[in-house]
Amino acid sequence: MVKLFSFLLLVWVASPAFSSEFLKASGSNFYYGGQKVFLSGVNFAWRSYGSDFGNGQYASNGPALKDWINKVKASGGNTARVWVHVEGQVSPAFDSHGFVTSTDSKKTLINDLSDLLDYANGQNVFLILVLFNGALQNNSNVQNLFWDESKLNSYINNALTPMVNALKSKPSLAAWEVLNEPEGTLQPGSDQNSCYDTSTLAAQGAGWGGKKFPMKQILKTINWISSAIHNADSKALVTVGSWSELTQTDSFGYRNHYKDSCLTGAGGKSNGIINFYQMHTYSHSGKWNQNAPFKVNRWAYNVNDKPLLIGEFASVCSQNEGIQNLYKYAYNNGYNGALTWQFNSGGDCSDTYSNQMYGMQALKGQNDQSGGKGGMVSVNIN
C-alpha cells in the first residue's frame, strides 16, 4: 500500500498543473467556464518596441505593463494584446548563420512572459501574445524564416515549442498570434490558386512596409507555426491579425486567404490553422470602408465557423461615433471582441490611454448571453 501511494503521489506531482478552465473557441463564439465571452480590451502592443521581453529587458518594462493591466481591469476590460518578438530585436536568439538557438541570449523570455501572465491572471485579464510583426519586418534573420525551412524549424524547435510548453498551463493566455498584419510585407501578385492570388490588393495599399513575401510563403509560415503550437498544446487558440476585412472574408468579392483550406494547402499541416479570425479597421479621411466592421454586422462576412475579433480600432480614426459607441456596436452586432489601439498612445490612429479606459467602461459588467450579443465581459480567470 505504501508503494502504491508513493507511485500515485509521483504521478500526481509529475502531471501538468492545468487549470480546469481556458478560453475556448466553439462555433462563432468564445467561451470560458461555459459562458459566452466578449474580449473587451486594448492593444498594449509594446512599451519598448521589440524589447519588452527577453535579455533582462523585462525588469525595466514589466512594471509599466503591469500598471497597464491594472488600468484595463479598473476600466472593466478583460483583454490585452501584447507583442513579443516583433522584428527580432531581442528575441529569438539567432546564431551567425541565421538559425535560432534559443528564446533569447540570456534565456529570460519565458520567465518574463510567465510573470506577466501570472499577474494578468490575478487581475482577471487575458493576454493575446503576438509573435512577429508583419506590418514591418526589417530583420533579415526573421525574413529568412519565411524562406528557409531549416531555419523555420530551428525557431519552432528551439524557441516556439519551449515557450508554448512552458506557458500552456497559464489560464490567462488567451491566444497566440503568429503575425500582426502580414499584408504589410506582402508582395502582391497573380496566381491561378485564389488562395495565393493577391493582385487586387496592390491597389489597396498592401506591401506598405516593403513587398517581401508572396502570400503562399506567408500562409506556409503561418501553417507551420500554428501546427507547432497545436502540437505542443492542442487546446491553444491561434490567430492572425489582418490589416482589414479585405483578406479574411469571401463576401463582397473579397478573398479569405486565411481559411483552413488556404493555410493547409500552402503548408501541408492539417492542424496548422487559425482558431479565430481577427480584423483591424481604421477610417480613411474620416470615412470607413463601406464593408468595414463598424459598417456591417459580423454575419455579413460569412465566417461563422469561428469567432471574429476586431483586433485593432481607434476612435481618432473612425467616423466620430465616439469610443464607447464603437465598443457597444461590436458587442451588439455579433463580434466577439474589440481592442483599441494603442495603450502607449504612440503613432497615428492611436487613442490616448485615458480615452481607451473610458471606452472600456461602456461594457463594464455586461453579460448578455442571447444570440448576436457579445456575452460575458467580467471574467473570473481561475
Curated annotation (Swiss-Prot):
GO terms for molecular function: mannan endo-1,4-beta-mannosidase activity; oligosaccharide binding; polysaccharide binding. Optimum pH is 3.5. Maintains more than 50% of the maximum activity at pH 2.5-6.0. Not active at a pH above 7.0. Potential use in mannan-hydrolysis industries which need especially low temperature and an acidic condition such as the food and the animal feed industries. It is found in: Secreted. Substrate binds at residues 83, 144, 147-151, 180, 187, 204, 208, 243, 282, 284, 341, 348. Its main location: secreted. The active site is at 181 (proton donor/acceptor), 312 (nucleophile). Its EC number is 3.2.1.78. Changing residue 341 to F: 2-fold reduction in substrate affinity and 10-fold reduction in substrate turnover compared to the wild-type. Activated particularly by Ca(2+) and Zn(2+), and to a lesser extent by Na(+), K(+), Mg(2+) and Cu(2+). Activation effect of the divalent metal ions Ca(2+), Zn(2+), Mg(2+) and Cu(2+) is reduced significantly by the addition of EDTA. Strongly inhibited by Mn(2+), Hg(2+) and Ag(+). Residues 1-19 form the signal peptide. Monomer. This is Mannan endo-1,4-beta-mannosidase.
